[in-house]
UniProtKB/Swiss-Prot annotation:
This is Ribosomal RNA small subunit methyltransferase G. Belongs to the methyltransferase superfamily. RNA methyltransferase RsmG family. S-adenosyl-L-methionine binds at G96, L101, D119, A120, T121, V147, E148, R161. Its EC number is 2.1.1.-. Keywords: Cytoplasm, Methyltransferase, rRNA processing, S-adenosyl-L-methionine, Transferase. CDD domains: AdoMet_MTases. It comes from the Bacteria. It comes from Chlorobium chlorochromatii (strain CaD3). It is found in: Cytoplasm.
Length: 234
């Protein structure tokens, strides 16, 4: 059993039907004052369907879900916009994108920015490329490569949902960040030591991060218990 905002209780016997993701997503976004155009909601729901479909073929996300994909993965990704506004012409890198998270949901609601999704696993990138094509997204591309291969490219923002330690993500991201760029991570658990280590190692990475912010999101929904948005700044 899990809870949605406003303490709506859902059990396995009352799990959302396929026609309900629109209402669930719209309700959650309204709770957070996140205004989405109807066509954005349509694409986000369609992405959720595609993600589940591809996940049955290859391992993109856990197959033992305790909450609908539209909440646990897609809405979770959208919460980044509570702490960062994507600007026109902004270049964004999704580091270790897996099944397109958080990059594809963010690209859907921020068409003014351009997104590059990278992952070292070819079959995951193939899935992302197929989903991007199906969704007809023109501001996002997916490439099969390791982050070390992105020589000479710079980004205003790097986002990541992968489980690597913050210190490691900062080491990967620093050479790719614009001089006023930031790294935004979706993380969970106790992060005090992880953040401390990244700050202590900053001199190895040209002073990055100069500071780190931690934003708990457990008040949004119990589904996100112990989940945080972590932002590392130049």
């Amino acid at each position: 059993m899990y809870l949605l905002p406003n303490t709506t209780t859902i059990t396995k016997s009352t799990m959302p039907h396929p026609q309900q993701p629109h209402a669930i997503l719209e309700g959650l976004c309204k709770e957070q004052s996140l205004a989405l155009a109807p066509e954005m909601v349509d694409k986000l729901v369609e992405y959720g369907r595609l993600l589940e479909e591809w996940n049955n073929k290859i391992n993109l996300i856990s197959r033992k879900e305790d909450a609908p994909i539209i909440i646990k993965h897609i809405f979770h990704s959208l919460l980044i916009t509570q702490h960062h506004t994507f600007q026109t012409g902004e270049k964004v890198l999704d580091l270790g994108t897996g099944g397109g998270l958080p990059g594809i949901p963010l690209a859907i609601i921020a068409p003014q920015a351009t997104f590059l999704l990278v992952d070292a696993t070819g079959k995951k990138i193939t899935a992302c490329q197929e989903m991007i094509a199906t969704l007809k997204l023109t501001n996002v591309t997916a490439r099969h490569l390791r982050v070390e291969e992105l020589h000479g490219e710079t980004f205003h923002t790097i986002v990541s949902r992968q489980v690597a330690l913050l210190n490691k993500l900062c080491a990967y991201g620093e050479p790719l960040l614009h001089e006023k760029g930031k790294l935004i991570c979706l993380k969970g658990g106790s992060l005090e030591q992880e953040i401390k280590q990244s700050l202590e190692a900053s001199q190895k990475h040209h002073g990055f991060p100069a500071r780190v912010e931690e934003h708990p999101i457990d008040e949004v929904s119990p589904i996100f218990s112990e989940k945080k948005i972590v932002i590392a700044y130049r």
